[in-house]
Design a protein with these regions (language model features):
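Basic, nucleic-acid-interacting segments
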Residues: 1-196, 213
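Long, charged low-complexity interaction segments
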Residues: 196-215
């Protein structure tokens, strides 16, 4: 909980907060793009363990989102935890997006975008949904909190379902899994075994050998 990942932006370095990371079990996936009016269920991944990273709402553009995802992918691949292939489903990203007027302090109503199978599709979906929400607000309409499916071929999105609140997900504990207590000593032991991350190694080389950023 309460971690973060540093990215490079046009304005310099920026830290994107990570609210939490938790483990889930894949239930399968819906395939929408092969038929125009039919969705099918693919259970090939059913039961596969996955890790969900819940990010803080710190990103302000499609470029920042892509920079964040690329940094996450680099770290995960470097650690050997996953090959992070979006087209094969070993890395996935759902995008929650809202707009607000300049100077406003409260976030607007957010929507969640799904069916994003590449970084380019994610960037296009963000730009498309941003424009859609701005257009609704300028027309005096309200943005509905909902989950939308991105169609990259049509470069547009479609409403899938109204967005549920937390209680609608019906969370319940798994009775066959015993609680695991993670001690500070165990965490320290794991951290001691971690390899030096690529970015940390790069910074160390730059300092030790006086290598400029250009090189």
């Amino acid at each position: 909980r309460n971690g973060g990942v540093e990215i490079e932006t046009a304005g310099g370095k920026k830290t994107i907060g990570i609210h939490e990371i938790h483990m889930e079990e894949d239930a399968g996936k819906l395939v929408h793009d092969e038929w125009e009016d039919v969705s099918i269920v693919d259970y090939n991944r059913s039961g596969v363990p996955l890790i969900e990273i819940v990010s803080e709402p710190d990103m302000r553009s499609a470029d920042e989102v892509i920079a964040y995802l690329e940094k996450l992918r680099m770290i995960i691949q470097y650690l050997g935890a996953s090959d992070c292939k979006l087209n094969e489903g070993s890395m996935r990203a759902d995008v929650n997006l809202s707009v607000r007027e300049v100077g406003a302090t409260e976030f607007g109503t957010r929507t969640e975008m799904k069916n994003l199978n590449s970084f380019k599709a994610i960037a296009r979906a963000i730009e498309g949904e941003r424009e859609r929400q701005i257009e609704l607000i300028e027309m005096g309409k309200s943005v509905v909190q909902e989950t939308r499916r991105w169609d990259d071929n049509k470069e547009s999105s479609f409403a899938m379902r109204s967005k549920e609140d937390a209680q609608d997900y019906r969370y319940f504990p798994e009775p066959d899994l015993v609680p695991i207590v993670i001690s500070d000593e165990w965490l320290a032991e794991v951290k001691a075994r971690e390899p030096e991350l690529r970015t940390a190694k790069l910074e160390r080389y730059k300092k030790e050998y006086d290598i400029p950023d250009y090189d």
